[in-house]
Amino acid sequence: RRQINELIKFTNNRNLWVNLSRLTLTYMDKGGENEVFHDGKVSVIKLNNFEYAGDDLENFFIRITVHNKFFSNVPYQMIGFAYNSEQKFCAVLIQPYILAEREATEDEIAAYMQALGFKMDYYDEYHNEDYEVFDAAPNNVLYGIDGNLYFIDTQIRLKS
């Protein structure tokens, strides 16, 4: 909680607030950590409440950086901070909106992750020397109309 309070102070001092009421957004979905909206054009906006960051917010920032390293075809861009519908402090993230043919299969995900140098631990969990990727399940990986895979909502952490 202390880190959240420090980040709120940082946001205030640097005027990093995103005024969501000025954006034309359509609600799409809500999960454990994200409220997801579409801008009607080419982007998905996620309000991430840091739920899965644990006690150290650095985990969140590592996750975003590593996601962009391995899954650069659907990168996160953090544009600021806001409060969500439950009045929880959130990072405001933008990702490209993906035109998907379907969800990726477990076999497609496994082949993709192995090509990146990851080893499978479980059907939706992988690791390499430095990182663990989990929740790489079909509902979080899209098979695009272009035939590419898009990892839109996986969890990543430093390997312990």
What label would you give each PLM region?
Residues 59-75, 89, 143-145, 153-155:
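Electrostatic, structured charged patches in enzyme active sites and in nucleic-acid/phosphate-binding
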Residues 38-39, 97, 143:
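Conserved hydrophobic "DFG−1" position in protein kinase catalytic cores
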Residues 21-72:
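ATP-binding glycine-rich loop module of kinase domains
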Residues 44-51, 96-98, 153-155:
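Active-site ExK catalytic segment of metal-dependent nucleases
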Residues 1-23:
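Juxta-kinase regulatory segment immediately upstream of eukaryotic protein kinase catalytic domains
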Residues 49, 68, 72-122:
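Conserved structural core of kinase catalytic domains
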Residues 43, 91-93, 132, 150:
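Protein kinase-like catalytic core scaffold
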Residues 126-160:
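Catalytic activation segment of kinase domains across protein kinase-like and atypical kinase folds
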